[in-house]
Curated annotation (Swiss-Prot):
Oligomer status and interactors: Homodimer.
Keywords in alphabetical order: Aminotransferase, Pyridoxal phosphate, Pyruvate, Transferase
Sites bearing N6-(pyridoxal phosphate)lysine, chain numbering: K192
Summary of the function given for this chain in its UniProt record: Involved in phosphonate degradation.
GO BP, sorted A to Z: organic phosphonate catabolic process
The enzyme's E.C. designation: 2.6.1.37
Protein name: 2-aminoethylphosphonate--pyruvate transaminase
Entry-linked SUPFAM superfamilies: PLP-dependent transferases
Classification via NCBIfam families: PhnW-AepZ, PRK13479.1, transamin_PhnW
Entry similarity comment: Belongs to the class-V pyridoxal-phosphate-dependent aminotransferase family. PhnW subfamily.
Gene name linked to the record: phnW
Amino acid sequence: MSNYKLLTPGPLTTTKTVKQEMLKDRCTWDDDYKNVTQVIRKQLLNLAQVDEPHYTAVLMQGSGSFVVESVLTTAVGEDDKLLIITNGAYGERIVEMAKVLRLALVVYSVPYDKQPSSLEVQALLEKDASITHVAVVHCETTTGILNPIKEIGEVVYSFNKTFIVDAMSSFGGVPMDLSDLHIDFCISSANKCIQGVPGFGFVIAKTNILEKCKGQARSVALDLYSQWEVMKKDGKWRFTSPTHVVAAFAKALEELVEEGGVNARYQRYADNNLLLRSRLSVLGFEAYISEELQSPIITTYLFPHKEFSFEHFYQEMKKAGFVIYPGKLTDVDTFRIGNIGDIYEEDMQALCEVIENYMVVKNNEN
């Protein structure tokens, strides 16, 4: 299988050195391995610009969705009510999880190309005093829109509610101070902006809030409190952990620091995104999200014309060494291009040249 450049929001292109960390086998009970887990937990707090004992980090096996569900099942009690803010498929997935868990919920939904309003969140909290928790996706990779978690967080905090943020595709790539943002549970995954590989996610939680969650989970494997209770002692996971993935993630964290930290990575991602948007605009590709609402993570593009075949376009990009993403909208034809991972200006320039040549050939055919 060819080694493609993955222009996706994760899994993504990783460095050779991150991959090499997975060549060694490790024992889950070994003290050296458990220490790796503890170091990772501390480094995650550093990235979030918070520290112990006010905050704590918990690693959880599975994809990002597993970790989101672990927070919902653990943090939202039987007598609580959850307000879920949605403007994309991943917010809607949180709604689906909440319904399966039979949580009391309120849904505030806005169109996919619009940001939710903090004023509307305020109105909803004023109207329904029984709401105890508020959940929102930071970077909604359905479209690439970046939601205003600072403004929403200030409202949630003013009402003394618990704030849950799905920062799956932003944490580590967009600067975040969890305390300043009033986030109580921040959720992300190994295979996103920190540039590890799939296999586990993590939660950075306010310690005093997590401590109140004992016995609330409706799941054994996804009980975030119980996972934390065991892990905080010496780095042991309750159940078998993805040892190779953990080792790769530890290396990815080292490389994030070497790059200059989150601010430097954010700038690289933003530069990649600006280059992509400017060059594709000249070629007639219109972005679905306006520039001021666009995240530096992934961009959704409208098909340039009715005859455009995404399948053919996708295969031609793949032949040239690039893998892109299909669209996730139901009402309009789109595709997506990510620019995170081990991707640099020269990669984006090369991609744009391939797209330009493709469009020239197709235009000549017509």
